[in-house]
């Protein structure tokens, strides 16, 4: 298509990438295609408006730059063809904005939607993100030699990003080498939040958020497949353990051909779980299957990874436990002796507010989600075109407002709980309750350094449990038939989407 037709797309240039139209801000030129898949296309692009000057504020002024600036532009396609794709896109937009500024989470620079000039409709979104040189999967697959300090640095950075994510009560749920972006200086950033979900200490509030779980099988926590009675932030720690094992061994540790084979490979390494763990499996078919298998002893990590640092194996042992209750937390992992060379409290910051999933996860209509996406794009485009100082001020105000709302919500919950426990006191004057005089620092403003700021874009900016039957009932059980195997595979593949007790 002739570039002269670009004005019908509101000043954007039209490119052909993988035989699809790739319509981007005319100030950018496509450098090369980075990849494509079921959900879209990614290209690298260079900022170039002819003068090789990058605008640094919303007044259109420009500043000289020795090197042109590069970005990764991701086109998410067919977002309104299915509810699940639309919700995934909305989740990605909101979370990338929410976590924007943390050094170990990919930075979102801009958003764009391209309406059809005739109908005004759109079915795709463009995300402008910081460009990284490769991902962890490519590094491991290349076979290039890495030192133990490389492993330490990579895992430490993953945990720093995950600590920030978990502190906002968010589960990533799709951590894998392909979702860890890396630069030549070994800087690492977590990407792809399309499968993320909220987390609550109240299990009843988590039950509805485990649908549409299709994370990569090799890095999926066993409690998801086995339908444990609850799921926690430990599911992400399992994935980090799988990544550490892959770094140490140069290949994935659990490479199941299907979900039943995946479970078999996990049990071959971790051994037969104790009865107390089996009883927490929500899927009775999975319980019966595990009990039908021969008793297996736990494998030795020293034999699996003979050249590995013993401290790395100790951390791996604590990450890869079948029972999620025994798995190390992200905070304890950061303090593990294996990572002490990199340990820096200033790098291990926590998010000061909780992410609000309820505002959109309960929305299922395509029209409603479409409007939410349009609103998100418009608000973010306006935000990133403000001067950096104003962005920081707005972000600080939003954080403080959200923290105050969450403080009030927690007070209301505590008051309701007190009234439930002491119904005779329900009629007491609210002014006499102890909560009015409760001292708290939840709403106290923190110093500015506690908040990750919008990144100073030096290179470019867009500014212008039920108990199971006893074990002896199953010890003589035969292996499942072909039909039972298929049913088990279906159940393990759906995990908590299928069975939640």
Curated annotation (Swiss-Prot):
Keyword hit for Hydrolase: no
Chain positions with Phosphothreonine modification: 211
Positions of region (Disordered): 400-450
A Pfam family it matches: Pkinase
Active-site residue numbers: 174 (proton acceptor)
Boundaries of every Protein kinase domain copy: 28-339
Catalytic activity: L-seryl-[protein] + ATP = O-phospho-L-seryl-[protein] + ADP + H(+); L-threonyl-[protein] + ATP = O-phospho-L-threonyl-[protein] + ADP + H(+)
EC number(s) per entry: 2.7.11.24
Gene Ontology BP terms: cell integrity MAPK cascade; negative regulation of glucose mediated signaling pathway; negative regulation of mitotic cytokinesis; positive regulation of calcium ion import across plasma membrane; positive regulation of calcium-mediated signaling; regulation of fungal-type cell wall biogenesis
Protein name in the entry: Mitogen-activated protein kinase MKC1
Molecular function, one GO term: ATP binding
Lineage: Eukaryota, Fungi, Dikarya, Ascomycota, Saccharomycotina
Family the entry assigns: Belongs to the protein kinase superfamily. CMGC Ser/Thr protein kinase family. MAP kinase subfamily.
Post-translational modification comment from the UniProt entry: Dually phosphorylated on Thr-211 and Tyr-213, which activates the enzyme.
Activity: how regulated: Activated by tyrosine and threonine phosphorylation.
Protein's UniProt keywords contain Transport: no
Top EC class, one word: transferase
Composition skew (Polar residues), residue ranges: 422-444
List of residues that carry Phosphotyrosine: 213
Domains as described in the record: The TXY motif contains the threonine and tyrosine residues whose phosphorylation activates the MAP kinases.
Domain of life: Eukaryota
InterPro entries per record: Kinase-like_dom_sf (IPR011009), MAP_kinase (IPR050117), MAP_kinase_CS (IPR003527), MAPK_p38-like (IPR008352), Prot_kinase_dom (IPR000719), Ser/Thr_kinase_AS (IPR008271)
Keyword annotations of the record: ATP-binding, Cell cycle, Kinase, Nucleotide-binding, Phosphoprotein, Serine/threonine-protein kinase, Transferase
């Amino acid at each position: 298509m002739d570039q002269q037709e670009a004005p019908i797309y509101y000043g954007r240039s039209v490119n052909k990438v993988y035989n699809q139209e790739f319509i981007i801000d005319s100030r950018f030129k496509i450098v090369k295609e980075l990849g494509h898949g079921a959900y879209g296309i990614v290209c690298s692009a260079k900022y170039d408006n002819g003068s090789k000057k990058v605008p640094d504020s919303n007044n259109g002024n420009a500043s000289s730059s020795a090197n042109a600036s590069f970005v990764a532009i991701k086109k998410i396609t067919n977002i309104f063809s299915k509810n699940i794709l639309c919700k995934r896109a909305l989740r990605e937009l909101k979370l990338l904005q929410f976590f924007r500024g943390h050094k170990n989470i990919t930075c979102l620079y801009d958003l764009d939607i391209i309406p059809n000039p005739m109908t005004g409709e759109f079915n795709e979104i463009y995300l402008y993100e910081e460009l990284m040189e490769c991902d962890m999967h490519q590094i491991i697959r290349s076979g290039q030699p890495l030192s133990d300090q490389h492993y330490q640095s990579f895992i430490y950075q993953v945990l720093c990003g995950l600590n920030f994510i978990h502190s906002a009560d968010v589960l990533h749920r799709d951590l894998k080498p392909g979702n860890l972006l890396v630069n030549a200086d070994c800087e690492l950033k977590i990407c792809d939040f399309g499968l993320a979900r909220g987390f609550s200490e109240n299990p009843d509030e988590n039950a509805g958020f485990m649908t549409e779980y299709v994370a990569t099988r090799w890095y999926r926590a066993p409690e998801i497949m086995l339908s444990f009675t609850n799921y926690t932030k430990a599911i992400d720690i399992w994935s980090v353990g799988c990544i550490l094992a892959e770094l140490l061994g140069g290949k994935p540790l659990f490479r199941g051909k299907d979900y039943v084979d995946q479970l078999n490979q996990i049990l071959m390494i971790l051994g037969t779980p104790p009865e107390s763990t089996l009883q927490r499996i929500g899927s009775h078919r999975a319980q019966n299957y595990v009990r039908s298998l021969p008793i297996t002893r736990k494998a030795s990590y020293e034999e699996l990874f003979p050249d590995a640092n013993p401290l790395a194996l100790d951390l791996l042992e604590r990450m890869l436990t079948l029972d999620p209750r025994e798995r190390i937390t992200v905070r304890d992992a950061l303090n593990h002796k294996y990572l002490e060379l990199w340990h820096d409290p200033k790098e291990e910051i926590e998010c000061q507010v909780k992410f609000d999933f309820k505002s959109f996860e309960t929305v299922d209509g395509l029209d409603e989600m479409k409007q939410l996406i349009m609103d998100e794009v418009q608000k973010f485009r306006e935000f990133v075109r403000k001067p950096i100082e104003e962005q920081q001020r707005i972000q600080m105000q939003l954080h403080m407002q959200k923290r105050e709302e969450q403080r009030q919500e927690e007070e209301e919950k505590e008051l309701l709980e007190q009234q439930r426990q002491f119904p005779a006191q329900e009629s007491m004057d609210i002014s006499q309750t102890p909560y009015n005089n409760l001292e708290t620092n939840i709403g106290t403003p923190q110093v500015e350094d506690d908040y990750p700021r919008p990144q100073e874009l030096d290179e470019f900016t867009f500014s212008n449990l039920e108990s199971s039957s006893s074990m002896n009932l199953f010890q003589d059980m035969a292996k499942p038939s072909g039909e039972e195997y298929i049913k088990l595979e279906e159940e393990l593949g759906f995990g908590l989407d299928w069975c939640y007790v």
